[in-house]
């Protein structure tokens, strides 16, 4: 594609504004795809964690020697959800890479126009910070365009996005005060449609955050420590019937059990506490 040199800065600005006129809607569409994938990902993750929790609860209640009639079905569903989560992550990388490529393409064109105007003496050279930013964006676009395979792009997009994004945010704050007039020319008042979309997005985001909090809470519960050894739940475990037991569940090996106890069972500490109470009652009598 041939490069048409701009005649003056105003024509370059007008061309750049025209080129990015659809960028907002295109970016929103891609970001909504990523968000939809995130929601589906956390739903799948919640499902397989729930199935895994049910399997472990059955083992706690009946021991590992008793067959769980639903374990095979649960394991198959867990496998399906894990595979779906993996595919969703791959799809998100592809969409994010498309968005990065789309933005970088416009930035490269703006940079080329600026360099052409500087060469023709129609534009003063950029300040040091702006030059560094332009060079950094150029390096990112080179990395993106040099990759010929999707896997290679996926490996570079994460680091590139973080690097360019963090530098851009820092420097835009510095330049914002200098470009008030230019921003006023390009900005548009928000439309009713945009406001409605923002309100719907805020509601959906709140629902998503609530689901994420619930999922994190469930994960924290799975990390609870039990037994004298203060470890997470694993293998065969037995529950103490002591009403005030501070450990609640015990691993068989830690309390010298080989099979589920018959009737009520108390841990050594609770048995000692019960014995002390009986001794105190006898002394009072």
Swiss-Prot record:
Subcellular location: Nucleus
Domain of life: Eukaryota
Keyword Metal-binding: yes
Residues annotated as binding Zn(2+) 2: 240, 245, 267, 270
Residue segments, region Disordered: 1-24, 155-201
GO cellular component, as recorded: cytosol; NuA4 histone acetyltransferase complex; nucleosome; nucleus; piccolo histone acetyltransferase complex
GO biological process: DNA repair; meiotic cell cycle; regulation of DNA-templated transcription
Residues annotated for Zn(2+) 1 binding in this entry: 227, 229, 251, 254
GO molecular function: histone acetyltransferase activity; histone H3K4me3 reader activity; methylated histone binding; zinc ion binding
Domain comment (free text): The PHD-type zinc finger mediates the binding to H3K4me3.
Subunit architecture: Interacts with H3K4me3 and to a lesser extent with H3K4me2. Component of the NuA4 histone acetyltransferase complex.
Protein family (similarity comment): Belongs to the ING family.
Protein name: Chromatin modification-related protein YNG2
Provenance organism: Eremothecium gossypii (strain ATCC 10895 / CBS 109.51 / FGSC 9923 / NRRL Y-1056)
Gene that specifies this protein: YNG2
């Amino acid at each position: 594609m041939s490069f048409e040199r701009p005649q003056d800065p105003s024509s370059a600005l007008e061309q750049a504004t025209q080129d990015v006129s659809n960028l907002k809607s295109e970016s929103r569409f891609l970001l909504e795809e990523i968000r939809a994938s995130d929601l589906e990902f956390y739903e799948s993750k919640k499902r397989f964690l729930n199935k895994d929790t049910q399997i472990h609860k059955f083992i706690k209640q009946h021991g590992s020697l008793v067959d769980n009639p639903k374990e095979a079905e649960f394991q198959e569903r867990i496998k399906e959800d894990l595979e779906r989560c993996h595919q969703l992550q791959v799809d998100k990388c592809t969409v994010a890479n498309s968005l990065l490529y789309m933005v970088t393409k416009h930035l490269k064109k703006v940079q080329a126009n600026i360099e052409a105007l500087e060469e023709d003496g129609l534009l003063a050279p950029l300040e040091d910070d702006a030059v560094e930013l332009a060079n950094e964006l150029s390096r990112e676009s080179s990395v993106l365009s040099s990759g010929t395979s999707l896997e290679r792009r996926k490996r570079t997009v994460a680091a590139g996005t973080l690097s360019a994004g963090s530098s851009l945010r820092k420097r835009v704050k510095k330049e914002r005060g200098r470009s008030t007039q230019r921003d006023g020319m390009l900005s548009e008042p928000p439309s009713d449609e945009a406001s409605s979309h923002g309100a719907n997005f805020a509601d959906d985001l709140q629902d998503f955050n609530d689901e994420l909090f619930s999922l994190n809470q469930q994960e924290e519960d799975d990390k609870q420590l039990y037994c004298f050894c203060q470890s997470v739940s694993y293998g065969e475990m037995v529950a103490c019937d002591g009403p005030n037991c501070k450990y609640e569940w015990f691993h068989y090996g830690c309390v010298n059990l080989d099979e589920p106890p018959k009737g009520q069972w108390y841990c050594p500490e609770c048995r000692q506490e019960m014995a002390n109470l009986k001794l105190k009652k006898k002394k009072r009598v």
